[in-house]
Amino acid sequence: MQQLKTDYLVVGAGAMGMAFTDVLLTESDAKLIIVDKHHQPGGHWNDAYPFVRLHQPSAFYGVKSKQLGENTIDTTGLNKGLYELATNEEVCSYFDQVMQRQFLPSGRVQYFPSCEYQGNGEFSSLLSKEKYKVSFEKEVDSTYMNVVVPSKRPPPFTLSGNVLSAPLNELSALGQKFEHFNVVGAGKTAIDAVLFLLRNEVDPDRISWIMPRDSWILDRAQIQPTLKSIGTALANQVVPGSESKNIDEFFSKVSDAGGLLRIDENVKPTMYRCSTVTKAELIQLKRIKKIIYYLMVKMPSITFGTPPFNFLNGPGSVSYTHLT
């Protein structure tokens, strides 16, 4: 077992671990060891579906010392007129550049990819039999939120009937094999699934959107790296929110002021997952008329009829026993 020594032992090389390390390198003379189970920095972005993008402008993401993206405004697509949204490949490449061109050349960072942390300063390689023991001053667990994308776990429900369950990573390769698509969840991943299908000319009638309840959605036009956007957010969110006496009144006032969006104007959302869309994307989402609400229970079981279905599950999926 190799013996190592450092000031900070950072577990995880995702956005949090990288941002923390960046600040320590900039504002102190500390030495750090980073341990991560992935083969390169980027955390769960390494496991994400190929067509995923940030839901926020690239300028808001990454580490303090290096800008992500080119700070450009999109001129085409559903994000037209707003600041660019980094792709999956761009995010992973960005974090890899930060590691290879900034962290490691500093001489103060040791990086151990493809390693599993066991706790108490011990970790081992996932590719060899090498084991390590670290003596450290402070341990920083940047994996505390335990983000697990659908491709790294089984669906949280059982299926019966002629049904295929697949994470979004497989969606682009499914082709015309299925008569119908059921998208499960009401968060960012589910929105991405629906928009991907519509963008690829799947008839809205071939899509069912299964969700626990409706969700409040942020307007991306009001989350931009500009002074105008800050002013709009103050007027549409902060001011009406500060005047609210309870949660229901908060969402009602902010929505009336234009600070929040909803898919169905006739249904009052009861969930908030911080999902972000443009109004052009919202128009597309409203094309889905088959929205099915389900009850949440501990022992899920789903039955569909004889037509072949494809089941896409996102991180917002919740297990359920029947549809209502």
Language-model-derived ranges and their functions:
Residues 8-30, 193-197:
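N-terminal Rossmann-like FAD-binding beta1-loop-alpha1 element of flavoenzymes
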Residues 43-93, 214-264:
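Glycine-rich active-site loop/strand segments that organize a redox cofactor
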Residues 26-47, 209-215:
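Glycine-rich FAD pyrophosphate-binding loop
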Residues 321-324:
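Conserved small/polar residues in nucleotide/adenosyl-binding loops
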Residues 81, 87-94, 141-201, 207:
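Glycine-rich dinucleotide-binding loop and its adjacent helix/turn
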Residues 4-16, 179-184:
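Beta1/beta-strand and adjacent pyrophosphate-binding region of the FAD-binding site
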Residues 249-274, 280-283, 289-295:
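Internal nucleotide-binding/catalytic subdomain
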Residues 77-148, 284-287, 298-305:
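Feature captures the FAD/FMN-dependent oxidoreductase FAD-binding
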